[in-house]
Amino acid sequence: AYAAAPFAPDAVRAVLPHLSLLVLNAVEAEQLRAATGEGVGALGLAHVLVTLGAEGCLWLHEGREWRFAAPRVEAVDTTGAGDTFTGFALALLDEGREMPEAVALAQKAAALKVTRAGAADAIPARAEAERFGEAPEAG
């Protein structure tokens, strides 16, 4: 896996042949297209995740494209949202989770992160991300 932030065309080109997963945001995806002349879907990678901020995430795999909507929240500070998403997604994939499950929890974590001011100190715990969006228990 490789997260292309900050984007450096030569660095990305150098690692592409060794990747099975590339994670980048929409701006970086456009920069990569400009640098290589190809869209991210034409790079021959097994998996590409493109984060789209409040619009969610795009997963490219085996010539297909899946879009995942992001949870709707009131953003306070978007610093670290992409890092939160990437960290959660990679940790879950490393556990053997399937991509849709990894993306779903990573998006919950990133959505929670942006509701708080700060960077690393505002990243939610996994249990908190897992509970996010659940209906409260009846009391």
Residue positions per predicted region:
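Conserved phosphate-binding/catalytic region of the ribokinase-like
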Residues: 36-139
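Conserved beta-alpha-beta core of the PfkB/ribokinase-like small-molecule kinase fold
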Residues: 1-39, 55-57
